[in-house]
Amino acid sequence: MLMDKKTKNILRSLFWVAVAVVLVYFCLRSVDWEQFMLAMEQCRWEYVILSMLLGALVFYVRGNRWRMLLLPFDPSTSRITTFNAYNICMAVNLAIPRAGEVARLGYVVGHSALDKDGRRLLTLDKALGTLLIERVWDGLVTIGMAAALVVLMWETFGAYLVESMAGLGSSNALWWALGGVIVFIGAFLWVCYSFRERGGIWGKVWGFIAGIGSGLSSFMHMKRVWLFFVYTALIWLIYWLMSACIVWALQDIEAFSHLTLADAFFLMIAGSISSVVPVPGGFGAYHGLVCGAMLSIWNIPVGTGMIFATLNHESQVLTQALCGLASYIHESFIRRK
């Protein structure tokens, strides 16, 4: 008997929750809790609070940048709409990995203006296209920053990053899977294009794909393109400062006292890479990757590295939850009035 879609989604979510639990367990089992609590007492909490405030600010800036991609389709899209969409997205992702993106798209489409025929100016397919171009752009920026870090600070980070990428690239299964996905997508697009004029389901599917293409091309129809790049630079500058704030918060602890702004930049990149693993809220994946990097580069024990990883990750989880709650209250009570 085949499972229905709801059951499959529940089982998929439970699987990734289990993965997160296992990752957290392996990270936490080596923690010296007496040392951990002592570190919390020595922590400069004003920097942690500053990092959380910067986290809320980056949601607003990201929302403004995404709004630039949406405006060619719906000029009425407001900053508060994209800000709320990002906040709700982050909060939903804490519970169900990747579901936040669906919530984000549904939110902006639901708040889109209507044309004279009563249809939404912004449709789901076009919104999805803008989300994809945003993700691709951020991925390219991350790769570019990692490459710059390797070139400029090879002695410190180069060997670790190259070794990590070499280990990833040596997996034949990964390359076969990637090639298979590309071939499948190409074949699917060719079939949809070939049968598009027959109407029915093929016409609808091709229409949806064409809408995604329109969303992807929204970059070329933006006004003030330079502002998009300014927003991007500001976003990553804020992320860097957030990482630096946690480094500064732990300066009174000997294991972290030598860390610099360059080290905070590396930890920011390492943390962004962990988001590829679709566990709820990044639990476990972030902790494991950051602790492993600290052990390899600075010989900081995993149990000690967990102090930084936990403080950085959980402070941002709290920020996401609070921002999501604030947007929910705004949407449910203030905006509807």
Predicted regions and their residues:
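Re-entrant/interfacial helical elements at transmembrane boundaries that shape
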Residues: 101-112, 279-296
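Membrane-interface alpha-helices at helix entry/exit sites of multi-pass transporters
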Residues: 79-82, 99-101, 114-135, 300-311
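Short intracellular "coupling" helices and adjacent cytoplasmic loop segments at the cytosolic face
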Residues: 87-102, 109-117, 216
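C-terminal transmembrane helix pair
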Residues: 277-278, 289-337
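Alpha-helical transmembrane segments of multi-pass membrane proteins
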Residues: 85-93, 129-141, 231, 307-316
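Transmembrane alpha-helix interface/packing and boundary motifs in multi-pass membrane proteins
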Residues: 91-97, 266-287
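Alpha-helical transmembrane segments and their lipid-water interface positions
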Residues: 54, 62, 66, 93-97, ...
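Predominantly cytoplasmic-facing regulatory/coupling regions of multi-pass membrane proteins
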Residues: 1-87, 152, 157-274, 315-337
